[in-house]
Amino acid sequence: MRECISIHIGQAGIQVGNACWELYCLEHGIQPNGQMPADNTTGGGDDAFNTFFSETGAGKHVPRAVYVDLEPTVCDEVRTGSYRQLYHPEQIISGKEDAANNYARGHYTIGKEIVDIVLDRIRKLSDNCTGLQGFLVFHATGGGTGSGLGSLLLERLSVDYGRKSKLSFAITPAPQVATAVVEPYNSVLSTHALLEHTDCTFCLDNEALYDVCRRNLDIERPTYTNLNRLVAQVISSLTASLRFDGALNVDVTEFQTNLVPYPRIHFMLTSYAPIISAEKAYHEQLSVAEITNSVFEPAGMMTKCDPRHGKYMACCLMYRGDVVPKDVNAAVATIKTKRTIQFVDWCPTGFKCGINYQPPTAVPGGDLARVQRAVCMVANTTAIAEALSRIDHKFDLMYAKRAFVHWYVGEGMEEGEFSEAREDLVALEKDYEEVGAETADGDGEEEEFGEEY
């Protein structure tokens, strides 16, 4: 088996996790108490969904997941929520005091006390696997726990499970919407760790998700639940081929192979289609060609950046539902002829497609319509550098005055770490610039991008 272990860190990670596991359970017909009436091989078996769920002898399906937070309230919601019977009590680990939006608290003072318990729990989960494929880490880079404890855990996972792939789903700070003043600090410090210790990072930001909810689903004031359910659909599409059998299955390691041209260039842009409310879906023909076109719409991106400002290096299309390879080839060919999507000149083809016959599942009472087919796009594009440089710029404005730095230093961090992380990101921006530059004229003037702050 190719098992995956999910690790949900901090409030964002846990709440996205809730939405994901709710969706997985619906997709596989697993009840909130872990029973699965349709499953004939009790206590194991080589069913495809066993990559994400382990089975007990009593026929109960338990997610291969760990929930971690430094304060109890969010974990308590899982412990008392409708899926409380799904998890083993030891899978939900909470501390007593908050990281208080402070990377240093999550990484040094408070995170240090909890990290060994978490690693022990992960070790128990991995002992339970026959062929562990890797880890999916869910966190936000702007807070304290997701950034600090998140990067601490990733560092320790690199040591303990060196060869296993680590994919991270990171909620990154949005341009206008912020939940904390020190977001840029936390984000730069944790991106520094993500650069080194993850194989692939999927960037999502709340503002882009808000816009998608407002525009496509006509939700005037989207709540976190709306956003998380949207994110869950994306993550479900990415992991569908691990959990179901399909025509063109895509493995976690295949993502890296096809999407990451250089180890540092691994920040991905995602989008999903059709995002459409039930009233509209009734009147629209959502053909393969149409949904394929709409995932490339700049407005539908899950991170605030404009793919037209950058070049694509690689692109992965994950179809699910009633889709045949012939339609996919036609849709991709159309996109190639349109020339709206610019690839770097050293990577001419750049599309990897996966097809999964399991149609997308709609959450009862959710916002998304039930549709026959859907597609999720993951792209490695130089446009994501816009989002990175935006955070770097905000970091610079604050750090020039050393604002708020004493909170970090007081928790045992050194000021040198700030400049080290920032220099690493300067190098990353440069890397993105060079990757997107034309190969023919290597010595031309490099133009700075990042026009909009």
Swiss-Prot record:
Its main location: cytoplasm. The active site is at E254. Undergoes a tyrosination/detyrosination cycle, the cyclic removal and re-addition of a C-terminal tyrosine residue by the enzymes tubulin tyrosine carboxypeptidase (TTCP) and tubulin tyrosine ligase (TTL), respectively. It catalyses: GTP + H2O = GDP + phosphate + H(+). Keywords: Cytoplasm, Cytoskeleton, GTP-binding, Hydrolase, Magnesium, Metal-binding, Microtubule, Nucleotide-binding. The record marks Y453 as: Involved in polymerization. One of its GO terms (biological process) is microtubule-based process. InterPro entries: Alpha_tubulin, Tub_FtsZ_C, Tubulin, Tubulin/FtsZ-like_C, Tubulin/FtsZ_2-layer-sand-dom, Tubulin/FtsZ_GTPase_sf, Tubulin_C, Tubulin_CS. Dimer of alpha and beta chains. A typical microtubule is a hollow water-filled tube with an outer diameter of 25 nm and an inner diameter of 15 nM. Alpha-beta heterodimers associate head-to-tail to form protofilaments running lengthwise along the microtubule wall with the beta-tubulin subunit facing the microtubule plus end conferring a structural polarity. Microtubules usually have 13 protofilaments but different protofilament numbers can be found in some organisms and specialized cells. Belongs to the tubulin family. This is Tubulin alpha-1 chain. It comes from Pelvetia fastigiata. The gene is TUBA1.
